[in-house]
Curated annotation (Swiss-Prot):
Superkingdom to which the source organism belongs: Eukaryota
Taxonomic source organism: Arabidopsis thaliana
Subunit structure: Heterohexamer; composed of 3 copies of TIM9 and 3 copies of TIM10, named soluble 70 kDa complex. The complex associates with the TIM22 component of the TIM22 complex. Interacts with multi-pass transmembrane proteins in transit.
Gene Ontology BP terms: protein insertion into mitochondrial inner membrane
Protein name: Mitochondrial import inner membrane translocase subunit TIM10
Single GO MF annotation: metal ion binding
InterPro entries, sorted: Tim10-like, Tim10-like_dom_sf
UniProt entry keywords in alphabetical sequence: Acetylation, Chaperone, Disulfide bond, Metal-binding, Mitochondrion, Protein transport, Translocation, Transport, Zinc
Gene it is expressed from: TIM10
Annotated compartments: Mitochondrion intermembrane space
Function: Mitochondrial intermembrane chaperone that participates in the import and insertion of multi-pass transmembrane proteins into the mitochondrial inner membrane. May also be required for the transfer of beta-barrel precursors from the TOM complex to the sorting and assembly machinery (SAM complex) of the outer membrane. Acts as a chaperone-like protein that protects the hydrophobic precursors from aggregation and guide them through the mitochondrial intermembrane space.
Gene Ontology cellular component list: mitochondrial intermembrane space
Pfam families: zf-Tim10_DDP (PF02953)
Short sequence motif Twin CX3C motif: positions: 36-61
Record text about domains: The twin CX3C motif contains 4 conserved Cys residues that form 2 disulfide bonds in the mitochondrial intermembrane space. However, during the transit of TIM10 from cytoplasm into mitochondrion, the Cys residues probably coordinate zinc, thereby preventing folding and allowing its transfer across mitochondrial outer membrane.
Length: 83
């Protein structure tokens, strides 16, 4: 369910904000995927599927990435008034 548009924000501004947020999320996902893949998957593929070690590594990597991303977000928004 979408959030209501904040008071004083036009629909065009809200659309622009949503578009910026979507671009940020896509970039975040791409960086996460690239970082964890490079860290956890061997450069020379031996099997078509991820092995158990690679699976565990990717799981931990993604978990840590999201945890740090949340911490950074909280720190950045700590001094800002709510929108």
């Amino acid at each position: 369910m979408a959030s209501p548009i904040p008071v004083g924000v036009t629909k065009e501004q809200a659309f622009s904000m949503a578009q910026t947020e979507m671009e940020y999320r896509v970039e975040l996902f791409n960086k996460l995927a690239q970082t964890c893949f490079n860290k956890c998957v061997d450069k020379r593929y031996k099997e078509a599927e991820l092995n158990m070690g690679e699976n565990s590594c990717i799981d931990r990597c993604v978990s840590k990435y999201w945890q740090v991303n949340g911490m950074v977000g909280q720190l950045l928004s700590a001094g800002k008034p709510p929108v």
